[in-house]
UniProtKB/Swiss-Prot annotation:
Gene coding for it: aroC
Gene Ontology terms: biological process: amino acid biosynthetic process; aromatic amino acid family biosynthetic process; chorismate biosynthetic process
HAMAP family: Chorismate_synth
Pathway this chain belongs to: Metabolic intermediate biosynthesis; chorismate biosynthesis; chorismate from D-erythrose 4-phosphate and phosphoenolpyruvate: step 7/7
Gene3D superfamilies recorded: Chorismate synthase AroC
Protein name in UniProt: Chorismate synthase
Enzymatic reactions: 5-O-(1-carboxyvinyl)-3-phosphoshikimate = chorismate + phosphate
Lineage: Bacteria, Pseudomonadati, Pseudomonadota, Betaproteobacteria, Burkholderiales
Record-stated family: Belongs to the chorismate synthase family.
Amino acid sequence: MSGNTLGTLFCVTNFGESHGPAIGCVIDGCPPGMELSEADIQADLDRRRPGTSRHVTQRNEPDAVEILSGVYEGKTTGTPIALLIRNTDQRSKDYGNIAQSFRPGHADYAYWHKYGLRDPRGGGRSSARLTAPTVAAGAVAKKWLAEKYGTRFRACMTQLGELPIPFENWEHVPHNPFFAPVADVQAYEDYMDALRKSGDSCGARIRVQATSVPVGLGEPLYDKLDADIAHVMMGLNAVKGVEIGAGFASVAQRGTTHGDSLTPTGFASNNAGGVLGGISTGQDIEVSLAIKPTSSIISPRESIDIHGQSTEVITKGRHDPCVGIRAAPIAEALLALVIMDHALRHRAQCGDVVQAVAPIPAVRLG
């Protein structure tokens, strides 16, 4: 299986399966000399961890990260950093009834046809469990970018199923299980309680933002910053759409309003989402993700088995009724990995470029 590594200079290779003994990643290309400990990584893993509310999977994994290599006396050495997360709460017996059939909307069918076999336990390699190493690697990238450029990452949910979530303030996001930017989440609690009782699932929309991104990241024509962002975001489980800046809303805009006016005091707007011509402008990078409903649900559905015969599928086990609820820290990590890789590439090629005129300020829209 190929496709398990992302990045050019900051390379991350992800390994493991949902019900295997462990999952993890190897980071190659991290600059030496950065202070790094397990605690630096664990904070983000705890934000993504399962079993933290009644609205997510009740699989109880501590997701304790172990640094196996690449750090000596508390600092990165420049050699590959191996990160390991042990699986401790697998319940493989829950998947015996679907080992010979395919879940509608799941990767089961495609994996079986491509590889000739599949691991049905928790989805195997296609499980969202494999986003934990991504978050771990993203924490390393976040730390370096914060120390080098002051870059910060944050994400929130802007829609849960049919319910839009109005933006109030980023300060609310850490204080509710939905990563919602609102003070009152009772409507979303009630919605998820009813959804879970019905045996169904729902999708979500996620907004992710990077601030204080340096100007000049991105490599035209085919390694554009926004192209790479879209590429890795589509690699996140259940993502079916990616928008940069105004995204699909730009279809209904006129050129007089879509173009972000430049003034000596700064940009007037940020419809471009911080990227022009595939290169960062110094504005906030703004990305939105459309996440489909979870395919593993307890409601019976029509499918076929591995012999091509009709069957009814009921998925037991512990699943997220909305995978979007835990997607915010994962989206942050993926965005950080792309920006980290492009920052190192920019430094390698254009590190000596100096402009007489400083970049203009970014507009701050919340």
